[in-house]
């Protein structure tokens, strides 16, 4: 049964005010379905921004209440279609530098602090980067990103210069591929050099909420991540930023992260599901219920109606329910293989996407 909660600032959820205005009755669980429709219509017709309290109330729908969850999923899908249409965006990445990362992110196979047996190598050549970029472009990807391990590019001019050379080289030898970059904590000056090299989007996840982040990483702060996002936006880069579900956070933490992303005006939100890596502190984390993941995705669509919600690493954890994500808010995906885990083929993803009526 759904229960009333007090908001952070005191008082009751708007849900109860809505019910009082409607019939002056005490809230009953059966009315949740009507409230979902009420919120959906306000978002579509009034460009309404839902509150933290409303989002948390939606999160209380039990994971086994399929009737109510399907109403939530359908509402999220309608919001997606109104604000984003049927276009589905596909991006790809290459692990361009692997291992020996100085940071202690507890989920990561590439941290020097943990013994995971991951591959270790330096920055790849521009020729290999171009080969992978062209292969992905030919298979139908819209975007391609180099991803490098390490804290960031601050104070690493040699690596920055090499990356600039690689991005320019890819840009000169591809036609439609949009270039993205993921290189950790960066100054405006370093990011401007990436812009000048042809990079259009910078990826830098928040990973979790401000409250929970110290449980994930202590070698840099949540504000370090936010400042890098602000630096990227300041030099004209689009920003791709999201997080990982299954780190041990609560669903309220996921909602708080989404609200921070909304405040930062992020329009591409990667949604990862933890793949526990042996040797990391999170190797024994419990898996999140697939329907809780789908419920969270739907709530993200209510919070960020205009954004690309992007399936990324770990979506295989959803199993047969992964396709449902494309009917409850997802409208983009990282396709192909991920950094240190196996993904899906571009062709397989394209087939599924088209079967569900999207345009690529």
Curated annotation (Swiss-Prot):
Residues 83-315 form the Radical SAM core domain. PROSITE patterns: RADICAL_SAM (PS51918). GO terms for biological process: biotin biosynthetic process. InterPro entries: Aldolase_TIM, BATS_dom, Biotin_synth/BioAB, Biotin_synthase, Elp3/MiaA/NifB-like_rSAM, rSAM. [2Fe-2S] cluster binds at residues 145, 180, 240, 310. SUPFAM superfamilies: Radical SAM enzymes. Its cofactor is [4Fe-4S] cluster; [2Fe-2S] cluster. GO terms for molecular function: 2 iron, 2 sulfur cluster binding; 4 iron, 4 sulfur cluster binding; biotin synthase activity; iron ion binding. Binds 1 [4Fe-4S] cluster. The cluster is coordinated with 3 cysteines and an exchangeable S-adenosyl-L-methionine. Binds 1 [2Fe-2S] cluster. The cluster is coordinated with 3 cysteines and 1 arginine. It catalyses: (4R,5S)-dethiobiotin + (sulfur carrier)-SH + 2 reduced [2Fe-2S]-[ferredoxin] + 2 S-adenosyl-L-methionine = (sulfur carrier)-H + biotin + 2 5'-deoxyadenosine + 2 L-methionine + 2 oxidized [2Fe-2S]-[ferredoxin]. Catalyzes the conversion of dethiobiotin (DTB) to biotin by the insertion of a sulfur atom into dethiobiotin via a radical-based mechanism. This is Biotin synthase. It comes from Fusobacterium nucleatum subsp. nucleatum (strain ATCC 25586 / DSM 15643 / BCRC 10681 / CIP 101130 / JCM 8532 / KCTC 2640 / LMG 13131 / VPI 4355). The gene is bioB.
